[in-house]
Regions:
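A glycine-rich, often tryptophan-bearing local segment used as a flexible ligand/cofactor-contacting loop or short
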Residues: 1-85
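Catalytic beta-strand/loop cores that center a nucleophilic Ser/Cys/Thr
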Residues: 49-127, 132, 136-139
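Extracellular ligand-binding/catalytic regions of CAZymes and related secreted enzymes
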Residues: 6, 24, 30-41, 45, ...
Length: 157
């Protein structure tokens, strides 16, 4: 149904933990890639990073381990979300790294570790915005409202 909704010009907002990690089958992973325009990168996994020396254009490869953090930048804002158990609010203890896939998809929010916290997609057919942590876990209420308004503006403009 979501595929059909997207093909008819839908606007999709998904926030929460486990968006990527719960999608295990080939069909589910194809849905992430084909419709939500993202791929899941497990926290703690090793990736190859390529550094280019601007002076002589030499390329050096190194292994990096990717992580999330409770500090996020995006939509012109910097904010934190609850990521540890506490008495005020439930915590997003398993935020996810979601990477953009294909044309017109991009990192819309970034953890301060440099990994992607949200993927936005805008085509002539439909739009989507997928977060790797729950929107409602953003600590500051006015910031949470600003983030939601920014997402809604992206989805509807």
């Amino acid at each position: 149904r979501i595929r059909q909704y997207a093909s008819q010009g839908g606007r999709i907002l998904i926030s929460g933990s486990y968006t990527g990690s719960d999608m295990q089958t080939e069909e589910e992973q194809a849905f992430l890639s084909d419709i939500l325009k993202l791929s899941y990168e497990p926290t703690g996994s090793t990736v190859i990073t390529r550094d280019i020396n601007p002076e002589d254009s030499t390329v050096t490869e190194r292994e990096s381990i990717v992580y999330t953090s409770p500090n996020v930048t995006g939509l012109g804002l910097q904010f934190s979300y609850y990521n540890e158990l506490n008495a005020q609010h439930y915590a997003a203890t398993h935020p996810e790294i979601l990477k953009p896939v294909g044309n017109y998809a991009f990192t819309a929010m970034q953890y301060d570790t440099g990994t992607s916290a949200a993927v936005a997609y805008k085509s002539t057919t439909y739009r989507s915005f997928v977060m790797g942590f729950p929107l409602e876990c953003i600590i500051d209420e006015s910031t949470r409202t600003s983030v939601l308004l920014g997402i809604l503006k992206f989805l509807t403009d």
